[in-house]
């Protein structure tokens, strides 16, 4: 993170108007870099710290897609989904904003020093905590309301049922913002099943959701056609899929890896896999 920072009080003209909608807005903000400009469109992308490789890859792709249609990305700077989303926005040449749950001069986690420095150059680091404030578990759920308020929509990519990302989603819903979620994890499945979130499986569906329209059915990639067809007969272990398809086990394992990364399948407890899309 850059060495300089400044503060803005809640009654200042430059204080983000979106944060004034909060029941308990911050008394002041500390900033390194800049605050989002008036009218700047942001998508919050949040999720698990202990995210899967596939989840992080998808978060990065979704962030790049959002930047491609003129949105910046805001998140909490944590390990896993947050970091992947910030990096995806940076890779696409877009703005990204990190909202800290600690002091403005504290890099947490410390391995994100380069990521935060890049975020300052492309957007900003924001905190309601002044210099020297150490990270504390109780500060991160409070921080999440700022993430939700700054964004026009919140996207949860991967989360457990008891996850800070779900707090962000609930805050977004309370503020009348759109909530989106990638199916395939306990927390996101719960958001979708309860009607809190609109399901989003890939970049195409994200852009349709942001535009407020229904996405056209996605075509199954040719390389995954037989595997997806086999999965539609029911969740199964790789060896059982190989028997269904008349394929070798290495071929099935390679296909499952591709299907997970592209959002067509997910791994279940017990080593089984199931299809994720109805199309």
Regions found by a protein language model. Name each.
Residues 2-279:
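Glycine-biased, small-residue-rich flexible motifs in mid-sequence functional cores and linkers
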């Amino acid at each position: 993170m850059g060495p300089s920072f400044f503060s803005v009080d809640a009654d200042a003209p430059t204080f983000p108007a979106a944060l004034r909608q909060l029941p308990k807005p911050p008394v002041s903000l500390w900033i390194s870099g800049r605050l989002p400009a008036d009218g700047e469109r942001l998508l919050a992308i949040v999720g698990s710290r202990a995210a899967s490789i596939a989840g992080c890859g998808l978060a990065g792709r979704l962030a790049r897609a959002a930047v491609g249609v003129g949105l910046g990305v805001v998140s909490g700077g944590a390990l896993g989904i947050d970091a992947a989303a910030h990096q995806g926005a940076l890779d696409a040449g877009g703005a990204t904003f990190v909202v800290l749950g600690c002091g403005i001069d504290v890099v947490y986690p410390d391995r994100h020093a380069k990521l935060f420095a890049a975020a300052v150059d492309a957007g900003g680091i924001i905190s309601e905590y002044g210099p020297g404030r150490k990270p504390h578990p109780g500060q991160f759920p409070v921080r999440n309301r700022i993430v939700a308020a700054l964004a026009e929509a919140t996207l949860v990519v991967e989360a457990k049922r008891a996850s800070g990302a779900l707090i962000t989603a609930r805050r977004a819903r309370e503020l009348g913002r759109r909530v989106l979620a990638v199916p395939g994890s306990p927390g996101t499945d719960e958001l979708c099943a309860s009607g809190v979130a609109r399901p989003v499986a890939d970049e195409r569906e994200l852009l349709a959701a942001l535009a407020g329209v229904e996405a056209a059915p996605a075509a199954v990639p040719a390389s995954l056609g037989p595997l997806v067809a086999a999965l539609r007969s029911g969740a199964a272990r790789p060896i059982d899929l190989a028997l269904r398809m008349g394929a070798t086990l290495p071929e099935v394992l390679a296909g499952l890896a591709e299907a997970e990364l592209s959002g067509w399948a997910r791994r279940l407890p017990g080593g089984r896999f199931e299809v994720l899309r109805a199309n």
